[in-house]
């Protein structure tokens, strides 16, 4: 079992953790989140981005992690970036707690997300269905108020 965590910080009140667990290279990865400080009753996009570089804030993380050259999509789509995690939903206080399994997110192997950045976006991810070029790249999910580098966890 490999475990990893991203501790979220940024230029906003959004904080939290996103954890990853994978039993072996052929198993799906469980992604769990506990994120506070978002807008209440909202859907917010979150993605794994290419770089683990946050020297200039979350913008240094680069584009979505996309080793196969696909267009942006929903986590359940066959045509999607590896880093496309979709949206999480917040409660009336702006907090989000949840988990999902993902078949493309890997902690083991050549396409591992270790050392890359998990970014929480300011808007809702349209899952590549927005009808414009930006939708096929970013899901029109907006600014990057919080992020954290994905590191090996104890």
UniProtKB/Swiss-Prot annotation:
Cofactor(s) demanded: Cu cation; Zn(2+)
Listed EC numbers: 1.15.1.1
Protein name: Superoxide dismutase [Cu-Zn]
Family from the record: Belongs to the Cu-Zn superoxide dismutase family.
Keywords: Antioxidant, Copper, Cytoplasm, Disulfide bond, Metal-binding, Oxidoreductase, Zinc
Residues reported in the UniProt entry to bind Cu cation: 47, 49, 64, 121
Cofactor binding, note field: Binds 1 copper ion per subunit.
Record PANTHER family: SUPEROXIDE DISMUTASE CU-ZN -RELATED
MF-aspect GO terms: copper ion binding; superoxide dismutase activity
Gene Ontology CC terms, in alphabetical order: cytoplasm
Annotated PROSITE patterns: SOD_CU_ZN_1 (PS00087), SOD_CU_ZN_2 (PS00332)
Upper classification of the organism: Eukaryota, Fungi, Dikarya, Ascomycota, Pezizomycotina
